[in-house]
Curated annotation (Swiss-Prot):
Function: Myoactive.
Listed InterPro entries: Pyrokinin_CS
Cellular component GO terms, alphabetical: extracellular region
GO BP, sorted A to Z: neuropeptide signaling pathway
Main location: secreted
Keywords, comma-separated and alphabetical: Amidation, Neuropeptide, Secreted
Signal sequence, renumbered to the chain: none
Name of the protein in its database record: Pyrokinin-5
Oxidoreductase as UniProt keyword: no
GO molecular function terms noted in the UniProt entry: neuropeptide hormone activity
Length: 16
């Protein structure tokens, strides 16, 4: 959505 890892989903999640 807005996070840096929205594509992979391994950074922080959808939006943090």
């Amino acid at each position: 959505s807005a996070s840096s890892g929205e594509s992979s989903g391994m950074w922080f999640g959808p939006r943090l």
